[in-house]
Amino acid sequence: MGKYNFTALRVRQTALRQHAAGKIRAPPKWLDVVADIPPAQVLVRNQAPQHQLVRQRVKTLPGTSKPQVVFEVQEKRIKPKKASRMFLPTEIKYEEDQLRQEFFRDHPWELARPRVLVESTGKDSEHYDWSRLQQPGKRLDGESVVQRQLWLLNNVPDMTKSAAYDIARREFYRLRLQEDIERRVAAEEAEATGATFGPSLLEVGMELENQEYERWKAWAKMEAQLLDQKTAAFTGAPEIAAADDAVEELEEKVPVPV
């Protein structure tokens, strides 16, 4: 039947023929079950449904005095697909993905901070009150800024994306500065009570730079000596050339006896 294989659909007919031909002694026990509930014979594959991104906003509509919750549907561009890509699974998108991409594009070094990747249900952010950025039991990170911005967009009337981003970033910078000050004060208090710390990151960097400079200086000295030796091989050693010049000057000054 061309490129279609109907062997699985005709398993009952095959079993009946084998039993009639004597290849199997007794019919299989599932023979009547397959007769009552036959396999599906749908050969047409349905295309996966395309879902749209729905966003919740609080807006003051014209003619109303109080803000209302409005659900907006983001218009999705309909792009022609190739036949080979028509039945691919639908891409799952959330509004947080765009906010997360924008934040980490502006703050790439936040990805270098250690993070806790253990989650219980994958919805840990729903267990916090994002009316404030700092949460008890959770470290301050980029995900906090994303959830705080999303909360502002969903609950503050007439809030724009850029304004929510500015508010969340301002709170984030203030808390990061507070953490830095607390860290410095704790280090100063520990040093005042006799604690000793190793070299700082700046001191470690300077030491590595000094080691690299000394290594380069030794290499440059050796290269200079090799270059001098190559030059002397063609023109003679500088000491020999100076001695020859002195002999020539003496010969010119002292008259040769006749």
Swiss-Prot record:
Homology family: Belongs to the mitochondrion-specific ribosomal protein mS23 family.
PANTHER family assigned to the protein according to its UniProt record, in alphabetical order: 37S RIBOSOMAL PROTEIN S25, MITOCHONDRIAL (PTHR37799), SMALL RIBOSOMAL SUBUNIT PROTEIN MS23 (PTHR37799:SF1)
GO cellular component, one term: mitochondrial small ribosomal subunit
Key words, A-Z: Mitochondrion, Ribonucleoprotein, Ribosomal protein
Primary location recorded for the protein, binned into one broad class: mitochondrion
Assembly information from the UniProt record: Component of the mitochondrial small ribosomal subunit.
Name of the featured protein: Small ribosomal subunit protein mS23
Compartments it resides in: Mitochondrion
GO MF, one annotated term: structural constituent of ribosome
Keyword Zinc: no
